[in-house]
Amino acid sequence: MEYLTHSLIAKSEARQIVNKLKAEKLSWQDGKKTAGSHASEKKSNFQLDKNSKLSIKLRDIIVNKIISNPLLKSFTLPSLIHGVMFTQSLAGHHYGSHIDNPYMPSGRSDLSFTLFLNAPEDYEGGELCIQTINKTEKIKLSAGEMIIYPSTQLHSVAEVKDGERHVCVGWIQSYVQNNEDRNFLFGLDAGAKGLLAKHGRSDELDLIFQAYSNILRRLGD
């Protein structure tokens, strides 16, 4: 499984978002409302109403941060970032093993992301657990850091034992649906840009960029 962790926002900005979320008293809903039929009984958390003014404002900030980041754009090749929501998990809350719906009302889920908004020492437990063939990856990042991983993977959120866990989650519909194809293009793009930075433009490098663009045309939606 290929996944990417990256610092999306500063810790100070993440702290400001958490403070705004804590000040919002009336717009929190039971997280079961947005879970698929197979996952609703496994889910316990609170989610900010997607239609609230605060949710819309914060969602736009996060989406703009993602699409303006060259590394994230290269890794995800996003055609649509959708379903973005803010969640709060208190002591006893968890989300059992599940897989994200392939098609949601807002779009197709090729990649999933979790942006951690508060510091790992603020809560005990609450790790994002991504299952692979041989092991389970347990992810708990610093405030402002995010993980992007294939939506094809089974995953869960460990029970929060103490404190509060605040995250932003969402999904990415990519121009290239297949994970292996997307990872191949990411490596090709990273290598070409590295050569450009180290050696400057050349006719040979132009051929690599041409190949990348034409492969993307062939593989893309």
Curated annotation (Swiss-Prot):
Q: How is the cofactor bound?
A: Binds 1 Fe(2+) ion per subunit.
Keyword list (alphabetical) reads: Dioxygenase, Iron, Metal-binding, Oxidoreductase, Vitamin C
Set out the biological process GO terms recorded for this chain's protein: DNA damage response; intracellular iron ion homeostasis
The residues that the entry says bind Fe cation are: H98, D100, H155
Q: List GO molecular-function terms, semicolon-separated.
A: 2-oxoglutarate-dependent dioxygenase activity; iron ion binding; L-ascorbic acid binding
**Protein's UniProt keywords contain Metal-binding:** yes
Give the EC number. 1.14.11.-
Tell me the residue numbers annotated for binding 2-oxoglutarate: R165
Per the record, the coiled-coil ranges are none
Residue stretches making up the Fe2OG dioxygenase domain? 80-174
The residues forming the signal peptide are none
InterPro entries from the xrefs? Oxoglu/Fe-dep_dioxygenase_dom, PKHD_hydroxylase, Pro_4_hyd_alph, Pro_4_hyd_alph_FE2OG_OXY
Necessary cofactors: Fe(2+); L-ascorbate
Q: Which Gene3D superfamilies match?
A: q2cbj1_9rhob like domain, Rabenosyn, Rab binding domain
**Source domain of life:** Bacteria
Record bears the keyword Coiled coil: no
List the HAMAP family.
Answer: Hydroxyl_YbiX
Specify the protein name.
PKHD-type hydroxylase PMN2A_0775
UniProt organism field: Prochlorococcus marinus (strain NATL2A)
